[in-house]
């Protein structure tokens, strides 16, 4: 029950964040990435620094998002400090997610061109720094993941409650749909 409540809360937070965007570019990003960002909700304990490694569900969702839209991952890292997000995201851990999940993904520095950032902007420099951190990690041997984003690890297995989790997922999706219909 605790996991279902947490997942429901995360879904509501992400939906609220996406509803809060104001200008047209952000509104377009919201529209484009809503479903993909919800698939990443299981990664929040890891990218928030509360879990040693991403879960298998997180890695599966992350892999789907990378295949569908790299831009959405870039948007999430870009907006990590947005107070409307309502959650903390450690950008180093977010950039490390492909390695932690053993997923081939473009370098985080590709976000500079994906998001059309000026090369000399603060945000572009932040993406470049994240890319260097990840390159340095990949050139060293894996160790334990720490809250500060250093080290490495393997995805943690997820215990399943069978149909109970699936029924909560249905409830969460229904709530998301209702909220979307009300506010869109």
Swiss-Prot record:
Question: How does gene deletion manifest?
Answer: Increased susceptibility to penetration of the epidermal cell wall by the non-host mildew fungal agent Blumeria graminis f. sp. hordei (Bgh). Some early aborted seeds and infertile ovules, and increased salt permeability in seeds associated with an increase in unsubstituted fatty acids but a decrease in omega-hydroxy fatty acids in seed coats.
Function text: Lipid transfer protein involved in seed and ovule maturation and development, probably by regulating the fatty acids homeostasis during suberin and sporopollenin biosynthesis or deposition. Contributes to pre-invasive defense against some non-host powdery mildew pathogens by preventing the penetration of the epidermal cell wall by the fungal agents (e.g. Blumeria graminis f. sp. hordei (Bgh)).
Q: Which gene encodes it?
A: LTPG6
The protein, known as: Non-specific lipid transfer protein GPI-anchored 6
What tissue expression does the UniProt record report for this protein? Preferentially expressed in the shoot apical meristem and the root meristem. Also present in the ovules and developing embryos. Observed in cotyledons, hypocotyls, flowers, leaves and siliques. Up-regulated in the epidermis of stems.
Which stretch is the leader sequence? 1-24
Where in the chain are disulfide-linked cysteines found?
A: 33-74, 43-58, 59-101, 72-111
Membrane-topology descriptor: Lipid-anchor; GPI-anchor
Give the residue numbers of the GPI-anchor amidated serine lipid attachment. 160
One Gene Ontology cellular component term attached to this UniProt record is: plasma membrane
* Classification via InterPro entries: Bifun_inhib/LTP/seed_sf (IPR036312), Bifunc_inhib/LTP/seed_store (IPR016140), LTSS (IPR043325)
Q: Which residues form the propeptide?
A: 161-184
* Location of region: Disordered: 138-158
